[in-house]
Regions:
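Conserved hydrophobic residue
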Residues: 50-51, 75, 264-265, 380, ...
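Charged, flexible cofactor/metal-binding loops and thiol motifs
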Residues: 117-125, 129, 144, 152, ...
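Alpha-helical coiled-coil oligomerization motifs
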Residues: 140, 144-147, 188-191, 257, ...
Length: 475
């Protein structure tokens, strides 16, 4: 098949080279963005009297027809035509003739590809924002549903201090809030228009980039044409966002895996989100959580891979940069499924609050509160720490816990203990006493939930603004 760029060559492209360099297998998903960009470019060319109005109308009608064919799955993509840009342009020229050949006037595949990816990433940011908000809502709903449940909090995966289950859920809410904030920067940098940069040096045709910018809804235009076609920072930033949100979901998944074991028995995942064993009939496996954990490393790989690709590239465009797309496309798909299915899992799980409380009643998670009790009586904290440590050791040897001791036992340990010590180190008191701003006391966690709803409202407003920009593109 003759190449649209083949005039300089005397030989056809080797089939192996075609297969190796073709990107149509993955960049076809940018067809809507490519067509929107081409329509805007043709409209601008006609406005500037670079092509005729008749050619513009033929181009736009032809592109509309092609989009309809692709939407219906009726468009035959060709590896020989390399990518989505050439596939569409070749079909357009076949359909409308000479006018189709004028579409590429004042444009290079370098700035064409760049503007497609910018628009695609903008759209992906909207999708990611909506998914984060839904996940945050699931966390708040679950924190409210189990608002009175107390669970062990952990350090080093050893029981440490009691916390409200809702406090634990809201910790993940805060992580996702930061993830949403990262999308702000991704969108800001994706919302810069590269079209008009040409191959690298700009255009001699008297194009109107400001007009094209308006048609495609971009907030600004690249100041430098060389930067415009070589910039992939916004892709790296998206992959960084994706890596961090997957890391947060992976940590949650690891906890859900642990909590759902018989050894913990803190939660039960819904049957709809688990799988069985081909040989062991009793098994209920948290495969979804395990896959989220596994796919996190894959997402990290896309980030590191692109950074490694970019680190040695001279300005401006190099074919290496084709490697930006498979990674970000896969990351978008991976984060989409991970967020949506985690939201469903959180909403569907059952929390075994009575068992969590029983675990706390049978261990030493209240030891810090016992030391705090002494410190508030004037005992230096380090001395109080030593006293309580000895008491814990004594209980371990006797096969009991601190709550099993009598007031007389406590007074024998230290004359600073009074009759109120057992109330002071009850599990409920341990939680209620931590009523500082970011603490786990019920009123603090309620404030976190209420603030979370305010944050979600602000995030939804931001998504609406993003959507307005994305949907302003004239197709």
């Amino acid at each position: 098949m003759a190449k649209l760029w083949g005039g300089r060559f005397t030989k056809g492209t080797d089939k192996a080279v075609e297969d190796f360099t073709s990107s149509i297998a993955f960049d076809a998903r940018m067809y809507a963005e490519d067509i929107a960009g081409s329509k805007a470019h043709a409209t601008m060319l006609a406005k500037q009297h670079i092509i005729s109005d008749a050619d513009r109308d033929a181009i736009i009608a032809g592109l509309t027809k092609i989009k309809g064919q692709i939407d219906k799955g009726e468009f035959p993509f060709s590896v020989a035509l390399e990518d989505i840009h050439m596939n569409i342009e070749k079909r357009l020229t076949d359909d409308i003739g000479e006018a189709g050949g004028r579409l590429h006037t004042g444009r290079s595949r370098n700035d064409q590809c760049a503007v497609d990816l910018h628009m695609y990433v903008r759209k992906a940011v909207v999708e990611m924002g909506e998914l984060i908000v839904d996940m945050q809502k699931a966390l708040i709903e679950t924190a409210e549903k189990y608002s009175d449940i107390i669970m062990p909090g952990y350090t080093h995966l050893q029981r440490a201090q009691p916390v409200l289950f809702g406090h634990h859920m809201m910790a993940y809410f805060s992580m996702l809030e930061r993830d949403f904030d990262r999308l702000l920067m991704v969108f800001k940098h994706a919302d810069i228009m590269p079209l008009g940069a040409g191959a690298l040096a700009g255009s001699t045709y008297g194009i109107d980039q400001t007009y094209t910018q308006k048609l495609l809804g971009f907030s600004r235009i690249y100041e430098n044409s060389m930067d415009a076609v070589s910039d992939r920072d916004y892709v790296v930033e998206f992959l960084s966002f994706a890596s961090l949100v997957m890391m947060h979901l992976s940590r949650l998944s690891e906890e859900l895996i642990l909590w759902s074991t018989n050894e913990f028995n803190f939660i039960e995942l819904d049957d709809a989100h688990c799988t069985g064993s081909s040989i062991m009939p009793q098994k209920k496996n948290p495969d979804v959580c395990e896959l989220v954990r596994g796919k996190t490393g894959r997402t990290y790989g896309h980030l590191l891979g692109l950074l490694t690709t970019l680190k040695g590239l001279p300005l401006t465009y190099n074919k290496d940069m084709q490697e930006d797309k498979e990674g970000i496309f896969d990351a978008i798909d991976t984060v989409h499924f991970a967020l949506s299915i985690n939201a469903a899992m959180i909403r569907g799980m059952k929390v075994n609050g009575s068992h969590m409380k029983a675990v706390l009643d049978d261990d030493f998670s209240n030891a810090t509160d016992m030391a705090d009790y002494l410190a508030k009586k004037g005992v230096p904290f380090r001395e109080a720490h030593e006293i309580v440590g000895n008491a814990v050791h004594h209980c371990i040897e006797k096969g009991c816990v601190l709550l099993d001791l009598s007031v007389e036992d406590f007074k024998a340990i230290s004359n600073h203990f009074d009759a109120d010590i057992l109330d002071a180190i009850s599990i409920e008191a341990c939680v209620a006493g931590r009523n500082n701003y970011s603490g786990t006391a019920p009123e603090c966690v309620e404030r976190q939930r209420n603030n979370g709803k305010i944050i979600i409202a602000a995030e939804k407003k931001q998504i609406t603004e993003w959507k307005a920009i994305v949907e302003s593109v004239q197709e």
